[in-house]
């Protein structure tokens, strides 16, 4: 996927400020702004992207987008080559390197960005209120550029196997967001100690089940 504009932590903050988060409750908006701020010592683009994905699902669960029954045609493009992203995850201990707090999360970012972008753009004419959350996801899909993309056939195969197993030809928007997150969680590495492992599924479940303020 061609990404038109390079984004750094220096200008991500202003871009986020220009993307109004009107349909999120204040606590969700504050959470997004906190993680998507320009504090590059704590959070990555990937974590910013995941925060918007998970909070969008939370808003679906709260029926705030008025589209709980909306379904979309699955337009996953399985011909895309496989790539993975190496993104530093702070506070994760690498068991092979003493006193190291920086493990790596590997995920199929290129495919996920491409698929999500196509869902948001190609389905837009059929959406009514359901288009509201997609502008944030589309926004981040185009902006996560500060990553290291490396070809990996194993990552591509695991991604396609996951899609073939779990995704039907027509799915709800909520399920698409969920499966996007779990698809991103498939290839984790390198091996970290259990205490410091960044578990994407645990993170998503925590965000989706937390008490509302």
Swiss-Prot record:
Superkingdom as given in the UniProt entry: Viruses
- State the protein's name: Protein ORF D
């Amino acid at each position: 996927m061609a990404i038109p504009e390079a984004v750094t932590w220096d200008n991500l903050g202003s871009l986020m400020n220009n993307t109004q988060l009107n349909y999120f409750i204040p606590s969700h908006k504050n959470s997004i702004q906190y993680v998507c701020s320009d504090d590059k010592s704590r959070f990555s683009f990937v974590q910013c992207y995941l925060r918007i994905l998970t909070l969008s699902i939370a808003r679906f669960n709260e029926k705030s987008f008025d589209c709980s029954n909306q379904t979309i045609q699955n337009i996953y493009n399985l011909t895309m080559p496989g790539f993975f992203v190496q993104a530093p995850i702070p506070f994760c201990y690498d068991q092979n390197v003493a006193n190291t707090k920086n493990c790596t999360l590997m995920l199929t970012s290129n495919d996920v960005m491409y698929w999500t972008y196509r869902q948001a753009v190609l389905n837009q004419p059929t959406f009514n209120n359901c288009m509201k959350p997609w502008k944030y996801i589309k926004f981040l899909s185009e902006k996560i550029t500060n990553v290291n993309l490396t070809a990996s056939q194993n990552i591509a195969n695991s991604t396609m196997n996951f899609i073939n197993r779990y995704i039907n030809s027509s799915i709800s928007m909520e399920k698409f967001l969920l499966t996007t997150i779990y698809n991103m969680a498939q290839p984790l590495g390198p091996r970290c100690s259990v205490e410091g492992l960044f578990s994407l599924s645990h993170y998503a479940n925590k965000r989706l089940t937390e008490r509302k303020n």
